[in-house]
A protein has these predicted regions:
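Basic, amphipathic N-terminal segments that precede the first structured/catalytic domain
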Residues: 5, 12-107
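Well-ordered, non-membrane alpha-helical segments in soluble/globular domains
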Residues: 90-94, 160-176, 213-229, 264-268
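Active-site segments of SGNH/GDSL-like serine hydrolases
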Residues: 150-157, 175-215
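A basic- and aromatic-enriched beta-loop-alpha substructure that forms the phosphate/nucleotide-
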Residues: 74-153
């Protein structure tokens, strides 16, 4: 076996990042549970060693967030828990835009669940609210808004290009707000997506969701990816994209099965990627290059294994179909799928990259950066060991 090319060692450095100064990095989340759950001890037990959660929003549309506040009085017309009441108040008041400059968080992580899943309601005066069927629909304000002449419900399902245009205008305003009010804050785009398979309770084999739900998830993913791509490319922000690594949902998720409640190996994987972004922000170029190459090797390994899993399961299904044909047909007109796909090998460069990093950063930073490789390997193990996906029936 050929040896990987040597990586030139770099001089050890002291990382000029907040956690070395003795305090955790403050992270604010403008998004949903797909991001917020990464800062929950159920999913990442040790996250508080390195991160502190600052002001957040939940499930707000960026279009609504960047329009003027809606300060009309309101009351719930259905039972709502305190968190749901806060959710409505936060969305209507845009309080996050006041809280962030006061906090000056080190990092803001964005995800666009609110726009991908809900859309907005445009009031006659041009203000917007998030059309959240789980929250504001339970208030008398929502009933009053819908009764106003000139009110419009807008979603990408109705007009993808029109909605995208409104969203880009809002994002441009948000980017200007960050530059003016949060000049030292690092913005990270978390690429959310919808899973379309679910692992039933007590089982290990994923099942496809019903076809209608799968089609809806795929359409939503296409628009969500459009949002992610724009936010990642237009404003010079960092991004974390695990959407091509093949994650499913599960009945035994702490919050129950849903397209955005991923298998539990997702959350350590996300945190490893965030560690890379945070730890290398002010690092020497050599360290940034090593961490980026380790990240790329881990991502390629998981994506290649995800593709292999799909191909291997298709191969097994093709073999099963061939075995059902009469023997004489198989002999005279074989239609076998050929050789089975071979799973990808672990990246040869990983060990060399880790060795170079060990000599370039302190022990804590090395332990965290090395999780780029270990969390990828954990997910690869799941991809290899999990039985083939079954149909929804």
């Amino acid at each position: 076996m050929s040896q990987p090319d040597p990586v030139t060692p770099v001089t050890p450095v002291t990382q000029d990042v907040p956690e070395v100064s003795g305090r955790p990095v403050t992270v604010s989340v403008l998004g949903s549970c797909i991001t917020r759950d990464n800062f929950n001890s159920r999913f990442n037990p040790d996250y508080k060693r390195w991160y502190r959660v600052g002001p957040t929003t939940n499930q707000s549309s960026m279009i609504a967030l960047m329009s003027p506040p809606v300060d009309e009085p309101w009351e719930p017309v259905q039972e709502m828990k305190p968190y749901g009441l806060w959710n409505v108040r936060s969305d209507l008041s845009r309080e996050i835009l006041t809280l962030l400059p006061e906090e000056q968080p080190d990092v803001v992580v964005l995800d666009f669940f609110g726009d991908a899943h809900f859309g907005v309601v445009r009031l006659p005066d041009g203000r917007f609210v998030t059309d959240n069927r789980w929250r504001i629909h339970k208030t008398d304000l929502y009933e009053r808004i819908l009764a106003m002449p000139g009110t419009e419900q807008l979603s990408w399902e109705q007009d993808a290009d029109g909605y995208f245009g409104l969203w880009v205008e809002a994002m441009d305003r948000f980017a200007a707000y960050v530059a003016d009010q949060l000049p030292d804050t690092q913005v990270v785009v978390h690429w959310g997506f919808n899973a379309d398979e679910v692992v039933p309770s007590g089982e290990s084999t994923p099942r496809r969701m019903p076809s209608r739900r799968r089609r809806a998830a795929r359409k939503r993913n296409a628009f969500w990816r459009r949002l992610n791509e724009h936010a990642s490319s237009a404003y010079g922000w960092e991004s974390i994209d695990l959407s091509r690594e093949y994650y499913v949902t599960l009945d035994d998720h702490p919050w129950g099965p849903m397209e955005v409640h991923y298998t539990l190996d997702y959350y350590p994987r996300f945190l490893a990627e965030l560690d890379r972004v945070v730890l290398t922000r002010s690092a020497p170029e050599e360290v940034r290059v090593l961490a980026r190459e380790l990240h790329e090797a881990a991502a390629e390994y998981t994506r290649d294994t995800a593709r292999w899993r799909i191909a291997a399961h298709e191969h097994q299904r093709a073999l099963a179909v061939e075995r059902e044909r009469p023997t004489w047909k198989r002999v005279l007109r074989p239609r076998g799928p050929g050789a089975a796909p071979v799973p990808p090998a672990p990246p040869a460069a990983t060990a060399t990259l880790l060795e170079a990093l060990r000599g370039a950063v302190d022990d804590d930073a090395f332990a965290r950066l090395s999780r780029l490789a270990t969390t990828a390997e954990e997910h690869v193990r799941w991809l290899r060991e999990t039985p083939p996906t079954l149909s929804a029936d």
